[in-house]
């Protein structure tokens, strides 16, 4: 995983914010991918990856929980 993948993931969530169910699913998937990359030492800068992924918190959409 590269930082560009995280940036692209955040961008995709922003593009899907009008469908909160999809946006929330994408956000959960992005967080899991970032955590897995960090846990398996497959990212060069864990702090930057996490910081970039957390930018999804600035995207306004409802979070759906079942």
Could you tell me what each predicted segment is?
Residues 1-25, 63-64:
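N-terminal acidic leader/helix
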Residues 23-66:
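Short, charge-rich amphipathic interface segments used for partner binding and complex assembly
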